[in-house]
Amino acid sequence: MRFKELIFPLRVEEEEIVEKFYEEGFFNFAIEEDEKGKRVLKIYLREGEPLPDFLKDWEIVDEKITTPKDWIVELEPFEIVEGVFVDPTEKINRRDAIVIKLSPGVAFGTGLHPTTRMSVFFLKKYLKEGNTVLDVGCGTGILAIAAKKLGASQVVAVDVDEQAVEVAEENVRKNDVDVLVKWSDLLSEVEGTFDIVVSNILAEIHVKLLEDVNRVTHRDSMLILSGIVDKKEDMVKRKASEHGWNVLERKQEREWVTLVMKRS
């Protein structure tokens, strides 16, 4: 599949543009540094797909036709947390570490973003052998794959974006792990209960998730909620408290916060 890559100078705060994309239901983007160290926004449009309305007045600094394979060439293997590597190139072959093979496609979440790193950090810290895990808003599937390789007995990964589901399914096959990936609008298609629910999405969507999360958890379950901008942390905490969840641990990188929660 061919895409048009458009590059814009980043004129607003990162969290502001991420929120805007999620509001518009647009997921094919990345925020990176260019060769001069300046933050830029990259978006990827399928053939014939229009430019999102809120970007029509933005200056385009570069434009080219590209494919997912082109993006993988630009990525190198890296250690996302101690002992866990992400490898978009399939260059790593080691038995003393967990290696996640990744074809990013155009779904958000290669492991480079702080919210993904913090999520994997807490999965590694709290996941026990044999736990069941639900990944809500799975994107590339990186958290679901990490959970399975860290010892989860059952992993379900869901996303509302059909292309994210396709990318996650491809990555699950690439890693040869048993993870069920399916479409779901938050928990609409999810059945059963899980020991850990991990979700790397926006604060406003966490608030909606918390309305129904008790249905898919039990008394000893744990929530790992990431993708929260620090100024909206209290909003998530209040909603969690309303439904019987308290913060067990908190981690922050730049303006991004990840919360680990248990039932009160």
Swiss-Prot record:
Keywords: Cytoplasm, Methyltransferase, S-adenosyl-L-methionine, Transferase. GO terms for biological process: methylation. Gene3D superfamilies: Vaccinia Virus protein VP39. S-adenosyl-L-methionine binds at T116, G137, D159, N200. Its EC number is 2.1.1.-. InterPro entries: Ribosomal_L11_MeTrfase_PrmA, Ribosomal_PrmA_MeTrfase, SAM-dependent_MTases_sf. It is found in: Cytoplasm. This is Ribosomal protein L11 methyltransferase. It comes from Thermotoga petrophila (strain ATCC BAA-488 / DSM 13995 / JCM 10881 / RKU-1). The lineage of its organism: Bacteria, Thermotogati, Thermotogota, Thermotogae, Thermotogales. The gene is prmA.
